[in-house]
């Protein structure tokens, strides 16, 4: 019986000691989390700049831009022509009643 009581007492003391140690452990504060976040973002930005300096990425961007321009130029010209036709039709409708 004494051994059982001693075991329960030892278990209680150990669990209380563990809880006390956990409370004393330093919790990360908001300032350190924000500083770590900004440091990570800065490192990511530096890596991105290093990658962007490479000629391969610049060549890909240039090819993409040229392809996009090739595809959009006819569409823009057609839209401009359609707009001019629409406005000229609208202007013709306005001038016809005035001449009658």
UniProtKB/Swiss-Prot annotation:
This is Apolipoprotein A-II. Coiled coil: none annotated. Residues 1-18 form the signal peptide. Monomer. Interacts with NAXE and NDRG1. Disulfide bonds: none annotated. GO terms for molecular function: cholesterol transfer activity; high-density lipoprotein particle binding; lipid binding. Keywords: Cleavage on pair of basic residues, HDL, Lipid transport, Oxidation, Phosphoprotein, Pyrrolidone carboxylic acid, Secreted, Signal, Transport. The lineage of its organism: Eukaryota, Metazoa, Chordata, Craniata, Vertebrata. Belongs to the apolipoprotein A2 family. The keyword Phosphoprotein applies. One of its GO terms (cellular component) is spherical high-density lipoprotein particle. The modification Pyrrolidone carboxylic acid is found at residue 24. GO terms for biological process: cholesterol homeostasis; cholesterol transport; lipoprotein metabolic process. May stabilize HDL (high density lipoprotein) structure by its association with lipids, and affect the HDL metabolism. It is found in: Secreted.
């Amino acid at each position: 019986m004494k051994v059982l009581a001693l075991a329960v007492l030892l278990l209680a003391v150990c669990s209380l000691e563990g809880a006390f140690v956990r409370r004393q452990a330093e919790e990360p504060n908001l300032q350190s989390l924000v500083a770590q976040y900004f440091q990570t973002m800065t490192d990511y930005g530096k890596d991105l700049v290093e990658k962007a300096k490479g000629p391969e990425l610049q060549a890909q961007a240039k090819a993409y831009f040229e392809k996009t321009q090739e595809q959009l130029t006819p569409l823009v010209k057609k839209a401009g022509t359609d707009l001019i036709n629409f406005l000229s039709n609208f202007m013709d409708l306005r001038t016809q009643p005035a001449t009658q």
